[in-house]
Amino acid sequence: MNIHEYQAKAIFVDNGIPTLKGKVAFSVDEAVANAKELGGSVWAVKAQIHAGGRGLGGGVKIAKNLDEVKDYASKILGMNLVTHQTGPEGKLVQKLYIESGANIVKEYYLAILFNRMAEQITIIASSEGGMDIEKVAKESPEKIAKVGIDPQIGFKMFHGLEVARVLGLDKDEGKKLISMIAKLYKLYMDKDMNMLEINPLIKTAEGDFYALDAKCSFDDSALYRHPEIAELRDITEENPAEREAAEFGLSYVKLDGDVACMVNGAGLAMATMDIINYSGAKPANFLDVGGGASAETVAKAFEIILRDKNVKVIFINIFGGIVRCDRIANGILEATKNIEVNIPIVVRLDGTNAAEAKAILDSSNLKNIKAATNLKNGAELVKSLVG
């Protein structure tokens, strides 16, 4: 689960992590009033959406007087903000964060995340803050520190010293940053986060560090332990189809391609997407029907993926185990009774009750269903149908 910057910063403040003063605004008048209350002569007017790249997309502006605050707030609030993380459809800006300015002398990047490859919590830090960290990693890998932490040991001084070394900090600056990282690490662990990112982390002329941005992502499976975090969920930021799918026990993520996928198991789903890409087509979604799929949930999956007008072919790839193939076949029939399906459906069923499933589909007389003998054959069929 993701939260907004202003929500993350409120959590930071509660845990002693330095941030600049700021207030959320839901209207232009409130934005101006917030700037007046904060005082000073410079403010950042920041769009609040669940995506990065807001500045490049025009969603972050620096105002040097109250008239500019009003002007920028008027332009940003209600805009459809498109960034490299939103996709071409963008996100509607419904709230702003008005933040006091600061005398910034240096920007850094800092993140704490779970490194699945290394099976460790990892601190990632760079002297190149305010930029796309993937670009820095590609062009200047020597400017990035990756410090692994064994959760059984926790964050120690030597971890912080390595970060300070790569960032080129002096002794006093290093002490301040290490103290800040220790608090961030504790917060990360205590709140069951997947990722905590500050980009940029700034150093002021006084040598102090502040989180100028804040991005926190939480483990959905652990939210029952943190009702105060669950309350921060903003469902307006979530894809409606993804939210609806979750209510039916389906894992669905919309993508930009034209081949809809319906698969059981996350691993097989990713392999299916890979082979679709390899064949020259593009997946339109990730959809895992899970281990408890029924005919009803399969029908719901059909309903959701067919709302995507970009979809030209549906590829159903099921390996029957816990999910019996005949259930999937009955779900396909149930879906086609209630929804008009005018596009080809490529079906690859193998495993438990695969023969029964094939018989069900054969007896249905559905003309737009094409059977695949294996995964490779399925991908080839999909590619030929997409064109």
Stretch-by-stretch model annotation:
Residues M1-E197, I202-I316, D326-I328, K337, ...:
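ATP-dependent carboxylate/acyl-activation modules
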Residues I318, N342-D350:
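Short internal beta-strands
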Residues G321:
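Catalytic core of bacterial c-di-GMP phosphodiesterases, primarily the EAL and HD-GYP domains
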Residues R324-I345:
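Amphipathic alpha-helical interaction surfaces in cytosolic regulatory modules
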